[in-house]
C-alpha cells in the first residue's frame, strides 16, 4: 500500500531535504505526484537499457532510490551475462530497495550497494542510468563524475540521464516553475506543501540548463546526445559513446 506524502503538510521549521526514513516511507507517492511523466520516464529508461545492454557487461543505476529504474532495466534485458549494480548514498533507501527487489524474480543478477557516486569504481559498463541524481551532486563535482562514467563505458555504451532543468532565461524559468507548481496542485499538494518543499530542496538540488548538459556531455566525448522526453522543467536524455 502506498503511503501518502504529507511531510510538508503542516507548518514547520524547514530543514534541507534529505532522503531519510521519512522520505523513504512516502517516496513512491511523492515522486508520482511531483514529477510529470515519471512512469513513462522509468519505463523508457528500461527499454533503452534493454536496447543498449551489451553481453558480459555491467549496467549501473546511480542514485537508485527504491529501485524503480533497476527493475525496469531488469525487465527489459535480453542480453546474456549482464549484471545490474544499483547504488545509493542513503542507507534507508538501500535497505528498502533490497526488500523491494526481493519481491520480483529475474535471472538478471542485481547488486544493491550503499556508496558515494564520487568514490564509486565503475567497470565494464554498457549502460549507466542517473534518474534525477546528478542534480543533487555539487556543481564542482559533476564534470568528474561524468568523465568517470564516460571513461568506463564500453564503445557504443550509453548514459541515460534524467534531470530537473532550468530555462535559459528568468522569464521562461518562472513559466516552467509555475506550470510545475500547477501540476503539483492538481495532484493534491497544498500551497504550504509546495512552498515548504521548495524551501527544503533549493539548497540541495541545483539544476543546470539543457544547453549546459549537452555542452558538457559533448566536451567529455560523447558522440551523440538527444533529449527524448521533456515536460515542464523535467527532461530525460541519452548520451552515446
Curated annotation (Swiss-Prot):
It is an enzyme of class 2 (transferase). The keyword Glycosyltransferase does not apply. S-adenosyl-L-methionine binds at residues 38, 63-65, 88-89, 116-117, 131, 198. Its EC number is 2.1.3.-. Keywords: S-adenosyl-L-methionine, Transferase. InterPro entries: CmoA, Methyltransf_25, SAM-dependent_MTases_sf. GO terms for molecular function: carboxyl- or carbamoyltransferase activity; S-adenosyl-L-methionine binding. Belongs to the class I-like SAM-binding methyltransferase superfamily. Cx-SAM synthase family. This is Carboxy-S-adenosyl-L-methionine synthase. It comes from Pseudoalteromonas translucida (strain TAC 125).
Amino acid at each position: 500500500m502506498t503511503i501518502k506524502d504529507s511531510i510538508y503538510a503542516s507548518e514547520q521549521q524547514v530543514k534541507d531535504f534529505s532522503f531519510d526514513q521519512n522520505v523513504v516511507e512516502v517516496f513512491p507517492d511523492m515522486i508520482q505526484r511531483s514529477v510529470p511523466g515519471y512512469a513513462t520516464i522509468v519505463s523508457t529508461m528500461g527499454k533503452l537499457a534493454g536496447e543498449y545492454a551489451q553481453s558480459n557487461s555491467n549496467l549501473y543505476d546511480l542514485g537508485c532510490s527504491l529501485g524503480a529504474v533497476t527493475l525496469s532495466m531488469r525487465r527489459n534485458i535480453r542480453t546474456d551475462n549482464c549484471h545490474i549494480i544499483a547504488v545509493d548514498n542513503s542507507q534507508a533507501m538501500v535497505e528498502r530497495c533490497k526488500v523491494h527487489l526481493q519481491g520480483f524474480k529475474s535471472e538478471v543478477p542485481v547488486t544493491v550497494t550503499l556508496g558515494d557516486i564520487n568514490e564509486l569504481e565503475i567497470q565494464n559498463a554498457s549502460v549507466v542510468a542517473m534518474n534525477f541524481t546528478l542534480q543533487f551532486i555539487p556543481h564542482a563535482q559533476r564534470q568528474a563524475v561524468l568523465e568517470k562514467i564516460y571513461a568506463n563505458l564500453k564503445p557504443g555504451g550509453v548514459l541515460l540521464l534524467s534531470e530537473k532543468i532550468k530555462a535559459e532565461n528568468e522569464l521562461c524559468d518562472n513559466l516552467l516553475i509555475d506550470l510545475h507548481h500547477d501540476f503539483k496542485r492538481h495532484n493534491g499538494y497544498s500551497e504550504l506543501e509546495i512552498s515548504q518543499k521548495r524551501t527544503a530542496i533549493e539548497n540541495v538540488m541545483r539544476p543546470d540548463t539543457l544547453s549546459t548538459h549537452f555542452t558538457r556531455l559533448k566536451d567529455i566525448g560523447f558522440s551523440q546526445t538527444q533529449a527524448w522526453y521533456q515536460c515542464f522543467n523535467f527532461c530525460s536524455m541519452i548520451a552515446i559513446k
